[in-house]
Amino acid sequence: MKTGGIDGCKIGWLFISFDKGNERWEVLETKEQLEEKFLETDRVFLDMPIGLEDEEYTRECDALMRKEVGGSYSSSVFSPPIRPALAAPSYVEANMISYEYTEKKLSLQSWNITPKIQMVDDLLTTHKGLEEKVMESHPEHLFQILNEGEIFQKKNLKKGIKHRLKLIEEEEPVVDDFFRDIKEEYRRSEIAEDDIVDAMVLALFAKWSKEKPLKTIPAKVEKDAMGLPKAYHFV
């Protein structure tokens, strides 16, 4: 069973796998490369919204995840665009559509990743059954599980990055080499340090899901109008 974690970055997507004997990292710069990775991998944990609402501003899974991570970390969970706004050509139009349906405007943070959400949505709706392999997950939630539920320094601080690396290194010693190699090959403006540690923790939990039962938030998973699950996955 091939597993991996994928996080978005400025130049595309960062894929990491900790599969025994085939540990590796790859940068996926095109939709075609992402599609190929989705198709060839048996389980991907992805930090990107998948199932979308049609008229509700906030997905149930996002509201529950904010409570789960708690405190100032709740801001790491934001509401993605509703499906009618997904193909809007501009932020202004996406805002108008969002307000028409929900009476709330789309956050700029959500708009900035809308092209990536749209890319993932297109691939998952084009390839039926792919949604059973590609699963939405939340890195900060996974780090909290790794750290036995404790809150620690945020990722925008050096201490936060080092702490997260140490947590993963206890399970996968290769992470130091991966972190160094990626930083040597790519600038921070292309792949940020938090993108690297996020892809790593996603990869770790995807690997663990081979042996441990999958869990979801919420426990009962609802699907959107296109049949995509609105849930966060973890083990």
Model regions and ranges:
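RNase H-like (RuvC/DEDD) metal-dependent nuclease/polynucleotide-processing core
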Residues: 1-3, 8-18, 22-235
